[in-house]
Amino acid sequence: MKTSIKEYLQEHDKAQINDLAAALGKEGSKDFRDLVKTISLMERRHELKFEDDGSLRLAQKKAPAITLKGIFHAHKNGFGFVSLEGEEEDLFVGRNDVNHAIDGDTVEIVITKVADRNKGTAAEAKIIDVLEHSIKTVVGQIVLDEEKPKYAGYIRSKNQKISQLIYVKKPAIQLEGTEILKVEIDQYPSRKHNYFVATVRDVVGHVTDPGIDVLEVLESMDIVSEFPEEVLKEAEQVPDAPSAKDLEGRLDLREEITFTIDGADAKDLDDAVHIKLLKNGNFELGVHIADVSYYVQEGSALDKEALNRATSVYVTDRVVPMLPERLSNGICSLNPNVDRLTQSAIMEIDPHGKVVKHTITQTVINTTFRMTYSDVNDILAGDEEKAQTFKKIVPSIHQMATLHGILESMRIRRGALNFDTNEAKILVNKEGKPVDIVLRQRGIAERMIESFMLIANETVAEHFTRLKLPFIYRIHEDPKAEKVQKFIDYASSFGIQIYGTASEMSQEALQEIMRKVEGEPYADVLSMMLLRSMQQARYSEHNHGHYGLAAEYYTHFTSPIRRYPDLMVHRMVREYGKSQEVAEHFEQVLPDIASQSSSRERRAIDAEREVEAMKKAEYMEDYVGEEYDAVVSSVVKFGLFVELPNTVEGLIHITNLPEFYHFNERDLTLRGEKSGVTFRVGQQIRIKVERADKMTGEIDFSYIPSEWDVVEKGLKSKGRERDGNRRDRRRKDKKVSKGSTARKDDKRKDSFSKSKKKKGKKPFYKEVAKKGVKHGKGRRKGSRTK
């Protein structure tokens, strides 16, 4: 009977029961009762439904849920967010919908709830499948455990977002419990078991080994110092000096007065410069870069390993090089008074900073001096003793300083943004323990060399763009309007008048904002906020210009010892012009090289930040209980981030403040309900160091009331009025050296802060929801700041 009912309704769309009974010949009392029972059963099974007029209709099959692919970002409390490519807003995933996904996994999701901009809640999603696991290996100390006799013990990941234990299969060697192991994941958490299972791949070291903490971070990211045997053998075959044959066909610049300018501890000297003042008033600037590509042949073991690494990694007490030291510190280092093969960008630059003529070619040089930044800065400051020591190049140094001023002014005129922020240098002893944190100095010499490298990179990029040849660019795309708007709102909270909308905001306008706040206590913080509103620079085979530099063309040509894209640019300088097949080859390989280089660069940055946060926290462990003056660097719903003069940043959680505080999202302030004490960015406050945790890289402060406290006018106050005169304050603080960046990519800043979304275009998932995605009930509400 069911088949007959379905066939009739398919043909007639809908029908009253009496009409259906008549059509099927079921009008008799018994047959009619059977018909009604069948209809009732089909309704319960959602095979048909009653319309408002009492007629019957076949139930439509539910449209299949639309699934999306994204990256899962876990929170240590169990929930997380999924980011989708090309979308600004992430989707919230409740702890019950995570489906055993791990931080960084590529996942398949369905949207269960759309965003509500009026309420400031984010869209919500459910993970239905893990497409690819991000974590393949884990590094950590083995904990011997007899509770699970089939395993040797377990490792607990340092990543706070991974709460599950990693059980380790018994290896062939006897473990003592002091080993730091690198293990390969065999099984991931699932419905069957909420833990990992792994196999020992390597013994990294022991907990008592000096520097093991840094090595553990590097190994956990698969950043390995040792080179494969095949690579080292190839490096050994590279000669110590160029031969006469190596010099054939090269422009001989050995008679030019060229010299290197680097940090005092630099060993890989990969760039040198020369300068001449021409009769027409222009400058000739030569930027000479070690010709690494001459020794690293494409497809060789050296080349494959260099591409795999793609960049050198610089952490507190060591460098993990892209190339073996025999090359980077040997024949590819432009040491004084020895012949070296180079590739050179020789530019004629007019008094306005415009390159009017250039040559890019293979050269040979012999540098005159190995200068340090401090040497050059001293000479420019009038140090007569240094000037006498290096008198042969003093005229060149002064000409270079003049040209640097011209180039810097040119960049400012066209709208280049200056993201100068304080950088810390952490000094460690032989055991790897931090003993001091100092600020990195950027004098004229440092900025001068930067100017010369920038103009060389621009010139090389424009040269190949105009030749319309496949090329690799360093691009920095325009910022998203939403992020610029957040920066505008942030800057406006300081009383800065800003004209125009975010979508119309030019580099010159942003530059003008930063010029207005020069010298203000919040200038550095505002500069950091501007930097965070930018997109991340990356490598690409397509030229999109460089927004931050306001440059139409840009590449990386000047550091082939430590960056693979630079090595590729050198290779193209040499190979182009040989045949049409060369261009076709580069066109084919460049996309993957650009992607690999960008990915490895991000990995290196993550490693550098994690080590820096760890070492800063370790340094501050010795200062727990001490009091200092600090500056508020960020205000969020859950508290204040404050920065010490040495750039160490810590959190004052809102629960550690003495009363209830109201958070003003627009002005980014916290104001005490009773006292009116108000905290805003750039304000100086007194703090006490409460906790420093090397393992997590976290530092906690507490607030101490002081004469620095600001009370908003019109509010009851225990302290001074905001516009009152400040008394001079001089305290003899115990030593915290000058010289930290925000901890681990500001993870703690974003952990609980759910900033409301601005009204704007309809999110893409509004449309997805209309196509039949079922909405969940009882999901956690909230949105987050990325």
Segments from the language model and where they lie:
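Charge-lined substrate channels and their catalytic hotspots, especially those that engage the 3′ end
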Residues: 1-286, 293-339, 370, 375-378, ...
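Intrinsically disordered, low-complexity linker and terminal regions at domain boundaries
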Residues: 105, 125, 653-699, 711-719
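Residue-level marker of beta-strand positions
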Residues: 106, 180, 354, 627, ...
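Short, surface-exposed secondary-structure boundary micro-motifs
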Residues: 112, 186, 633, 690-692
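Phosphate-interacting basic helix/loop segments used at nucleotide- and nucleic-acid interfaces
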Residues: 184, 253-260, 264-282, 400-414, ...
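Conserved catalytic alpha/beta cores of large enzymes that bind or transform nucleotide phosphates
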Residues: 312-413
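Append "with occasional cross-activation on large, charged helical scaffolds in nucleic-acid assemblies
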Residues: 360, 373-644, 658, 662, ...
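Intrinsically disordered, Lys/Arg-rich low-complexity segments
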Residues: 711-786
